[in-house]
A protein has these predicted regions:
Chain A
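Hydrophobic alpha-helical transmembrane segments of multi-pass inner membrane proteins, especially
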Residues: 65-326, 367-425, 452-456, 471-486
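Long extracytoplasmic/lumenal interhelical loops at the membrane interface
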Residues: 340-376
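Transmembrane alpha-helices of multi-pass inner-membrane enzymes
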Residues: 428-466
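Long, low-complexity, intrinsically disordered cytosolic termini of multi-pass membrane proteins
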Residues: 1-15, 468-486
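N-terminal membrane topogenic signal
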Residues: 13-34, 93
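Cytosolic juxtamembrane amphipathic/interface segments immediately preceding
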Residues: 10-21, 58-59, 83, 125-126, ...
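Membrane-interface capping segments at transmembrane-helix boundaries
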Residues: 9, 46-50, 219-222, 460-471
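Alpha-helical transmembrane segments of multi-pass membrane proteins
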Residues: 34-49
Length: 486, 144
C-alpha cells in the first residue's frame, strides 16, 4: 500500500493552464487533410473529364481542382481551430477520435458535393444553398459543437442527477412526434416547430443513452441479483425489470406509430448492449432478444407496412421498378463498384435525370460510396467506425466511475450499432426503413446528434488538465547574474 | 487522353491508399495505447477523501488500494481514520474477482454506503460513497 506519498489535494493541479502538445492528433489530422484534398482532386478531375466527354471535346490537360475548394478548406480550417483550442486548453483529451470523425465527415462532404446539388435546396436571405454547401454548413456547426462540448463539459452532474428529467424530455419528444410529426415516405419522423424542422429520433438516442447510463449505474447491483424465480428462470427483483418492459414497449410503439423500423431496432439494440455492459449477464440479452423476436413476429402479422418492408427485403425483384426499386438499385450500384470502385464522381449514372438510388444522400450513402470507392473503400469506412467504437470502449474502461463508464460505452455503441444497422440494411442483410449513416449522411439533426455523442465522448476521455510543468531553470546572462548575487 | 486517364486512375488509387494509411496509423496508435494499458499491475481502485471534519485523513487526498484494505482508528489499519465516531477496527474493503465489497467489522456507529447502513457485506460500485464516523470516502477506479 503506497499511501501518503501520493496524497495531495486535487485543487493544486490545474490552477494555471499550460498548453500541451498533441503530436498524435496533429499528425493524424494532417493525414486527414491530405486524404481529403486528394479525394477532392480526384472528384473534380473526374467530373471535368465526364463533362468534356459529354460535350465531345478531348482535353489536352486535366485540372485537378476541387469542385468546391472553399467549403473543403473552411471545413479543414475549422477542425484545425478546434485542434488548436484543445492544445491551448492543455487537457488530456483523446487524440484519435477527432481525426477519425473528421475523415468520416469529410468523406460525407465529398459525397454531398458529388451528388446533384439540387437534391436539397434551401434559401437563406436570397442565397440559394445546394446540397454540398448545406452539408458543409451543418458540418461546421457539428465541429463547433464537438469542440464546445469537449472543452466545456467539466462535470457530469447535470447528466447524472437529472436522468429522470432527461427521460421525461425524451418521452415527451417521442409523443410530440407521434402526434404532430409529418409523414415523409410513409414514416412519421419529422417534427416541425415553426421554421425549425428536425428528426427527434436522432436526439432521442443520445437522451436514451444518458438516461440508461444513470439508471443502470445506480441500480447495477440490484439488477445483477437473482431473487425472483420463474420456473427455470432466475430474474432480478420485479420492479427493476420494469424499464426493460418500458423499453420494449417504446421500441414497438415506434414501429407501430412512426413506422420506423431502423430507429426501433437501434434503440432496443443499444438498450440490450448497455444492459450487458452494466450487469455482465448474458441471460438479459437472450431474454431481450426473445422478447424482440416475439414482438417482431406479432407486428409482422398485424401491420401491413412491416409486411411490405419484409417482402421487399426477401424478394425485391418481385417488383423491381416499384416497391423494390431502391433495394434493387442499391444492389446494382454496389455491383458496379466492384473491388476498387468507379472513382469518385464516376458512378451513379442518372436515369432520365433522376438518381438511380432514391434517398441516396440520407439513407443509402453506402450504396453510392460502394459504387464509387468499391469494396476496398467501404471496408475502410467501416474500419473508421470501428476505430470510433474502440476509442469509446477504451474511454469507458479508463473512466473512474460507473456512470461515466457506462455512458461512454453507450455513446460509442449507439454510433457503432447505428452504422452497423444502416450498413446491413443497405447491403440487404436486414429489412430496413431509413436511419442515417452517422457523420456521413446529409441532415442537420443527424449531424448534430452525432456531434453531441462525439463531444461527450471527448469530454469523458478528459483525464484532467496535466500537472503544470516544473519551472524551467532560466539560462542566460540575467539568471547567471542573479545566481552570482545570491 | 490516355495519359490523363492513367493519371486520374492513379489519383483515385492514391485516395483509397491514403484511407488505409490513415487506418494503419490509427491502429498503430491504438496498439501502443493498449500495450501501455496492459503493462504493469494496474491499480485496483482508489479511495478519495470527500469530507473529513478533523483533517485526518486530509480532505482531497486519495489512497491507492490493495486487495484487502482495513479502515479504522487503530494505527495498524491501512487507512487510519482519526475520528471519535470511528471504531478501532471499523470496516474492511476487499476486492474479490471483479468487484469491491465492504464489510462492517461490528463497529459501534456503523459503516454507511451511499448513506445506507451496511449490514454484513455489500458490493461497492465505482463512484459510491462510504462513510466511516464523520469521514466520507469515495471509491474511484484506479488509473492505468
Amino acid at each position: 500500500m503506497s499511501i501518503a506519498a501520493q496524497a495531495r489535494p486535487f485543487a493544486s493541479a490545474g490552477t494555471r493552464i499550460r498548453p500541451r502538445i498533441r503530436t498524435t492528433e496533429t499528425a493524424l489530422l494532417a493525414l486527414v487533410a491530405v486524404t481529403l484534398l486528394v479525394g477532392a482532386a480526384s472528384l473534380g478531375a473526374t467530373q471535368r473529364l465526364i463533362e468534356a466527354g459529354k460535350a465531345g471535346e478531348s482535353l489536352a490537360s486535366l485540372d485537378f481542382g476541387a469542385p468546391d475548394p472553399v467549403a473543403l478548406v473552411v471545413y479543414l480550417g475549422t477542425i484545425g481551430l478546434v485542434h488548436v483550442a484543445f492544445i491551448l486548453a492543455g487537457r488530456r483529451i483523446d487524440q484519435v477520435l477527432l481525426p477519425a470523425v473528421a475523415l468520416l465527415g469529410g468523406i460525407g462532404l465529398l459525397l454531398m458535393q458529388r451528388l446533384p446539388q439540387d437534391l436539397v435546396e434551401q434559401e437563406f436571405a436570397g442565397l440559394v444553398l445546394g446540397l454540398g454547401q448545406l452539408q458543409a454548413m451543418w458540418l461546421l456547426i457539428a465541429i463547433a459543437v464537438i469542440g464546445a462540448l469537449a472543452l466545456g463539459v467539466r462535470s457530469d452532474a447535470w447528466l447524472r442527477n437529472y436522468k429522470y428529467t432527461w427521460a421525461a424530455a425524451g418521452i415527451g419528444l417521442l409523443l410530440l412526434t407521434f402526434v404532430f410529426g409529418s409523414e415523409v415516405n410513409g414514416a412519421r419522423l419529422t417534427l416541425s416547430i415553426g421554421p425549425i424542422s428536425g428528426q427527434p429520433s436522432e436526439l432521442l438516442k443520445v437522451i436514451l443513452v444518458v438516461f440508461l447510463a444513470g439508471y443502470l449505474s445506480e441500480n447495477r447491483s440490484l439488477l445483477a441479483e437473482e431473487s425472483t424465480r420463474l420456473g427455470p428462470l432466475r430474474l432480478p427483483p420485479i420492479p427493476y425489470l420494469a424499464p426493460m418492459g418500458v423499453m420494449w414497449a417504446i421500441a414497438l410503439g415506434i414501429v407501430v406509430v412512426q413506422r420506423d423500423l431502423g430507429a426501433a431496432l437501434l434503440f432496443f439494440a443499444v438498450f440490450l448492449a448497455m444492459l450487458y455492459v452494466a450487469t455482465g449477464r448474458l441471460s438479459y440479452v437472450v431474454g431481450g432478444l426473445i422478447l424482440f423476436i416475439a414482438g417482431a413476429f406479432v407486428l409482422y402479422h398485424l401491420f401491413g407496412h412491416v409486411q411490405q418492408r419484409v417482402d421487399n427485403w426477401l424478394d425485391p425483384w418481385a417488383d423491381p421498378s416499384g416497391a423494390g426499386f431502391q433495394v434493387v438499385q442499391a444492389l446494382y450500384a454496389l455491383g458496379r463498384g466492384g473491388l476498387l470502385g468507379m472513382g469518385l464522381g464516376a458512378g451513379l449514372p442518372t436515369i432520365g435525370g433522376r438518381l438511380p438510388v432514391p434517398a441516396v444522400h440520407t439513407d443509402y450513402p453506402l450504396a453510392a460510396l460502394g459504387e464509387e470507392l468499391g469494396l476496398i473503400g467501404l471496408l475502410a469506412i467501416l474500419g473508421l467506425y470501428l476505430v470510433v467504437v474502440e476509442r469509446g470502449l477504451r474511454i469507458a474502461a479508463a473512466a473512474h466511475d460507473d456512470f461515466r463508464s457506462i455512458l461512454a460505452a453507450g455513446l460509442a455503441l449507439v454510433m457503432g450499432i447505428q452504422a452497423f444497422i444502416i450498413a446491413a440494411g443497405n447491403l440487404k442483410l436486414i429489412p430496413l426503413t431509413g436511419i442515417t449513416l452517422p457523420l456521413i449522411s446529409y441532415g442537420g439533426s443527424s449531424l448534430l446528434a452525432n456531434a453531441i455523442v462525439v463531444g461527450l465522448l471527448l469530454a469523458l476521455s478528459d483525464r484532467g488538465a496535466g500537472a503544470p510543468a516544473p519551472p524551467r531553470r532560466r539560462r542566460g546572462p540575467i539568471a547567471r547574474l542573479r545566481r552570482a548575487r545570491a | 487522353m490516355d495519359g490523363i486517364v492513367l493519371t486520374l486512375w492513379l489519383v483515385r488509387l492514391l485516395f483509397l491508399a491514403l484511407l488505409y494509411v490513415f487506418l494503419f496509423a490509427v491502429v498503430r496508435v491504438l496498439l501502443r495505447d493498449l500495450r501501455v494499458a496492459s503493462r504493469g499491475p494496474a491499480e485496483l481502485g482508489r479511495l478519495v477523501v470527500v469530507a473529513s471534519p478533523r483533517g485526518e485523513p486530509l480532505p482531497g487526498a486519495f489512497f491507492q488500494l490493495d486487495a484487502v484494505t482495513t479502515i479504522g482508528r487503530d494505527v495498524n489499519n491501512s487507512i487510519v481514520v482519526d475520528d471519535p465516531f470511528a471504531s478501532a477496527d471499523h470496516a474492511v474493503l476487499t476486492f474479490r474477482g471483479r468487484a469491491w465489497y465492504v464489510e462492517d467489522l461490528a463497529s459501534t456507529n456503523g459503516t454507511f454506503l451511499n448513506a445506507i447502513a451496511v449490514e454484513g457485506i455489500a458490493e461497492v460500485g465505482f463512484g459510491d460513497e462510504l462513510q466511516v464516523g464523520e469521514v466520507r470516502l469515495r471509491l474511484d477506479r484506479g488509473r492505468s
